[in-house]
Amino acid sequence: MALETFVNSEPFTFGVELEIQIVNTHNYDLTKAASDLMRLIKDAKFPGNITPEITESMIELSTGICRTHDQALGELHAIRDTLVNAADQLNVGLCGGGTHAFQQWSERQIFDAPRFQYISELYGYLAKQFTVFGQHVHIGCPDADSALFLLHSMSRFIPHFIALSASSPYVQNVDTGFHSARLNSVFAFPLSGRAPFVLTWSGFEEYFTKMVNTGVVNSMKDFYWDIRPKPGYGTIEVRVMDTPLSVDRAAAIACYIQTLARYLLIDRPLKLSEDDYLVYTFNRFEACRFGLEGTCVNPQTGERRTIAEDILDTLDRIAPHAAALGSRAALDEIGALAKARVNDASWLRTIFKQEKSLNETVRQQCLRWRE
């Protein structure tokens, strides 16, 4: 199969995708209701889209093409409200969070769609264990080579996105010690991690053709990279974030990525090199394990600082671009998180410490999702 032609798109437009948990309102375990939710909302009017995901206990909402923070917020609130109204009719709850705190993966049911059934057959139990919930952000790129430049430039900031969105400290009744345990599930897939260091679209087409010829991949969907190009949309897709506990947080993170993209493509502050990836896995682990308190190492200078400090320094650098995009309010929220060194994983641990119950913690996640 040939690689799709890269469709040039309006630079720095963006779209947000959020995978959402569906829980019962008895003990707040995951429940099977995606098909019923899809039936209830099929005639509803809302921006963006709502689609099923790999198991019946999750559903995905996505915005349309956004240009500003206000637009993204408005669309996310409207789609969220549509889903919440449908969930109320079914007496089920919806919430964010990168993992469900105590669900048993073996109880999950694969959604009845050809691709999901194929993934289940190919990956076995990993497919059910993949009942984890992420935020993806698409960024519009003017051309294919710019997309690859942005992809590799943005990779330096992967720890920021992980630490800011982290909301998965609990897995199967256990505090994992991680801020984002979700990404450990993604890493189990053979084509996960980071994209190959290729800076021209012709070079990327050559790589893709070689991979297809091995029989390992059929399409771009088979790559579970942290950031991957989406040629049919004319975007790159940042895929490392946990689903935040609120749509407001999701919009703020998306606009941080949008503003950073404008800075990286217009100012071109980075000279890209394969050596940029020497500390990639280390920095990624630090963000997953320790959140905003984690250490990140600059691959070119060897300088070490906390992820929170690196975010605050980055916010200063990209401030002029925030003014141009109207994303100052979003970046103020990001700055407040970095200064306080708190994220949704911190919030979940605080609630559990108060309530001594993961069931109650998930119930409060559902309340937070409606705010």
UniProtKB/Swiss-Prot annotation:
EC top class, as a word: ligase
Q: Which GO terms describe its molecular function?
A: ATP binding; glutamate-cysteine ligase activity
Q: Mind telling me which Gene3D superfamilies this protein's record contains?
A: 3.30.590.20
Query: Which UniProt keyword terms apply here?
Result: ATP-binding, Ligase, Nucleotide-binding
Report the EC code(s) recorded for this entry.
6.3.2.2
| InterPro entries with a match to the protein in the record | GCL_type2/YbdK_subfam, GCS2, Gln_synth/guanido_kin_cat_dom, YbdK
What reaction gets catalysed by this protein?
L-cysteine + L-glutamate + ATP = gamma-L-glutamyl-L-cysteine + ADP + phosphate + H(+)
**GO biological-process terms attached to the record:** modified amino acid biosynthetic process
- Domain of life (superkingdom): Bacteria
Q: Which NCBIfam families match?
A: gshA_cyan_rel, PRK13516.1
Family to which the UniProt record says this protein belongs: Belongs to the glutamate--cysteine ligase type 2 family. YbdK subfamily.
Protein purpose: ATP-dependent carboxylate-amine ligase which exhibits weak glutamate--cysteine ligase activity.
PANTHER family given in the database record: GLUTAMATE--CYSTEINE LIGASE 2-RELATED
Q: What is this protein called?
A: Putative glutamate--cysteine ligase 2
